[in-house]
Amino acid sequence: MPLLNTVTTPYAEAFLQVAESRNEVDEVVTQAKSILELWNSCPEFSDAMSSPVLEVNQKKAALEKLFSSQVTPSFLNLLKLLADRQRIGLLNSVLERLLEIYREQRNIALATITSASALNEDQQSELLKKVQSIAGTDNLEIDLKVDSELLGGFVVNVGSKVIDASIAGQVRRLGLALAKVS
């Protein structure tokens, strides 16, 4: 188990147990995804929570103000506990681990689909069918991303499998093939 998981797993497992005992798992998972999105998209938030300059009470007050009406009371307690224990800077890792454990418990495969441009519903539906056959399960959580550097096509990551059907990937493979010939 990686060192970071040694720190994050106990928090994630305990919080999932609390959520299960209160029948809040689905709600908590949705909230965890929202907070992770905020953490990853707002460097001011993650920097403030990771800052050694801000005192614990200031961080807890900020968390209370930001999330008291957005999350369950048990989720707010987790946030405050992480602040008290000087672990709030690891919030993203704790929440990512929580989502991993949630998926493991429910046998949900995470598929990340990165495309060169946004996919319409028909494209998403068609791609979903193919990803389900690759993953060997209908129980999938799809994470759609857009990366214009792919130039065209898409890249699918499911577990340890990677399917690169992007133009950038084809160009890279062509370059490698030409390098072998020369």
From Swiss-Prot:
| Membrane topology, record value | Peripheral membrane protein
Report if keyword S-adenosyl-L-methionine is assigned.
no
Q: Give the UniProt keywords, A-Z.
A: ATP synthesis, CF(1), Hydrogen ion transport, Ion transport, Membrane, Thylakoid, Transport
SUPFAM superfamilies on file? N-terminal domain of the delta subunit of the F1F0-ATP synthase
Q: Which PROSITE patterns match?
A: ATPASE_DELTA
Does tRNA processing count among this protein's keywords? Answer: no
- Please tell me where this protein is predominantly located: membrane
Query: What InterPro entries would the database entry show?
Result: ATP_synth_OSCP/delta_N_sf, ATPase_OSCP/d_CS, ATPase_OSCP/dsu
* Disulfide topology: none
Q: Which GO terms describe its molecular function?
A: proton-transporting ATP synthase activity, rotational mechanism
- Subcellular location(s) of the protein: Cellular thylakoid membrane
- GO CC terms for this protein? plasma membrane-derived thylakoid membrane; proton-transporting ATP synthase complex
PANTHER family hit by this protein: ATP SYNTHASE DELTA CHAIN
Question: What NCBIfam families does the record point to?
Answer: ATP_synt_delta (TIGR01145)
What does the similarity note say? Answer: Belongs to the ATPase delta chain family.
This molecule's function is given as: F(1)F(0) ATP synthase produces ATP from ADP in the presence of a proton or sodium gradient. F-type ATPases consist of two structural domains, F(1) containing the extramembraneous catalytic core and F(0) containing the membrane proton channel, linked together by a central stalk and a peripheral stalk. During catalysis, ATP synthesis in the catalytic domain of F(1) is coupled via a rotary mechanism of the central stalk subunits to proton translocation.
Subunit info here reads: F-type ATPases have 2 components, F(1) - the catalytic core - and F(0) - the membrane proton channel. F(1) has five subunits: alpha(3), beta(3), gamma(1), delta(1), epsilon(1). CF(0) has four main subunits: a(1), b(1), b'(1) and c(10-14). The alpha and beta chains form an alternating ring which encloses part of the gamma chain. F(1) is attached to F(0) by a central stalk formed by the gamma and epsilon chains, while a peripheral stalk is formed by the delta, b and b' chains.
Protein name as it appears in the record: ATP synthase subunit delta
Q: Which gene encodes it?
A: atpH
